[in-house]
C-alpha cells in the first residue's frame, strides 16, 4: 500500500539525457533527430555518443 501522494519510485536516470538536451537546443540537430533518431543525429553533429 502506498500512502496518498506517493507514487512509484523515480525511474533510473537516463545517462544520455544531458546529450539529448544538447541536441534539442540545436535546431538542426533536433530536426535531424526527428528523422533519424537522437543518437545518429548527435553523432553527426558532435561525434561519438
Swiss-Prot record:
Gamma-carboxyglutamate residues are formed by vitamin K dependent carboxylation by GGCX. These residues are essential for the binding of calcium. Decarboxylation promotes the hormone activity. It is found in: Secreted. One of its GO terms (molecular function) is calcium ion binding. It comes from the Eukaryota. InterPro entries: GLA-like_dom_SF (IPR035972), GLA_domain (IPR000294), Osteocalcin (IPR039176), Osteocalcin/MGP (IPR002384). The modification 4-hydroxyproline is found at residue 9. Belongs to the osteocalcin/matrix Gla protein family. This is Osteocalcin. It comes from Felis catus (Cat).
Amino acid at each position: 500500500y502506498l500512502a496518498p501522494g506517493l507514487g512509484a519510485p523515480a525511474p533510473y536516470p537516463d545517462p544520455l539525457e544531458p546529450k539529448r538536451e544538447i541536441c534539442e537546443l540545436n535546431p538542426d540537430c533536433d530536426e535531424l533527430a526527428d528523422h533519424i533518431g537522437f543518437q545518429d543525429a548527435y553523432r553527426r553533429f558532435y561525434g561519438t555518443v
